């Protein structure tokens, strides 16, 4: 449904205004939204969390941190979901919601934060796809003729082709089922081969490595990665695709995401760390031993799943460009195809260039969590809910929301410093366009 500032009766005696958009909204079931959210949690990024979360935090910090991050993220996301129709208007974009509550400056600031967040996530997906593509190449031809930047460029091209072919988020349809199958392939392979290696291996070292100062920075950076694990930074955009009753249906999708949806991720993260300890790679499939064809299948699945996931996280950017330039009607019309080739192709080209320039995946996770996920998902969500529902909250609830705002603001600053330090160190150890 393409809508243009019209009023929609939701069957509860309330008229809800729907903003203009070139993309389809109000057409998906809560289950499809749940699959979009679950795809984000179980994307190929899960192959990195054993190395980027568990190694810096250890068993106690990693397990407790992931469980706490799950609970806190569920709470923060429910706050945003409940505000979707606040004030009699459907807020189909994160910036629309912030602007409605705070005003124009907050609208612009949220827009910048969100798009930086999504851009860095998408750079990470391109790095992931390129790394997996390189892993397949090395399995069969380890001659170093092709370097990581070459594989990142190929991955970017694949992402661009997919972006041109799928016009909007709701059009993913069957691709969400494909994404789930792909996720299961690399997760099952990683778990089975890790268990096989772990049973055979001698005792592992689970100590957190480094000096006290470096431990402090790596632990802080890992805390930012923890919040990156569970949060999309685009919940209103996903909720926009859901049928009425939109809040009730989105709550179902969130409960599915944070119960059933997190189980595969927990399994691969904990088993991977158990098998390899402090030597766990930021890309788990680089650690596992097994038949070449099995490892190749897992890596190819990770490549293709990253392409689908990138399209999900790039969809708010695509929606803005399509709406701004009035790209509506038949997606296969020549005008619309040419526009997607130019606009989306250009966006992915820039993302690919940055990914090849600085291919430090763990650092991207930490920096994204620090500068975007903390502010968007925790600071903004708590304060927006406090401001919107101020008259309905008791003193204790108000105090809790303010404590959350202050705590996560401090965490955001600390994590950003830690992430920038990691990037600076990696930049000294590796040149640009590094072959990691």
Swiss-Prot record:
Q: Which organism is it from?
A: Arabidopsis thaliana (Mouse-ear cress)
UniProt similarity note: Belongs to the amino acid/polyamine transporter 2 family. Amino acid/auxin permease (AAAP) (TC 2.A.18.3) subfamily.
Q: Which PANTHER family match?
A: OS05G0424000 PROTEIN-RELATED
Q: Name one GO cellular component term.
A: plasma membrane
What processes does the entry annotate via GO biological process terms? proline transport
* Record localization: Cell membrane
**GO molecular function terms listed in the Swiss-Prot or TrEMBL record:** L-proline transmembrane transporter activity
Q: What Pfam families does this protein's entry cite?
A: Aa_trans (PF01490)
Tissue specificity comment: Expressed in epidermal cells of leaves, sepals and petals.
Highest taxon of the lineage: Eukaryota
This molecule's function is given as: Proline transporter that mediates proline and glycine betaine transport. When expressed in a heterologous system (yeast), imports L-proline, glycine betaine and GABA across the plasma membrane.
Q: Which UniProt keywords apply?
A: Amino-acid transport, Cell membrane, Membrane, Transmembrane, Transmembrane helix, Transport
UniProt protein name? Proline transporter 3
Q: What happens when the gene is disrupted?
A: No visible phenotype under normal growth conditions.
How does it sit in the bilayer?
Multi-pass membrane protein
* Transmembrane intervals: 29-49, 52-72, 118-138, 151-171, 172-192, 216-236, 254-274, 296-316, 345-365, 366-386, 405-425
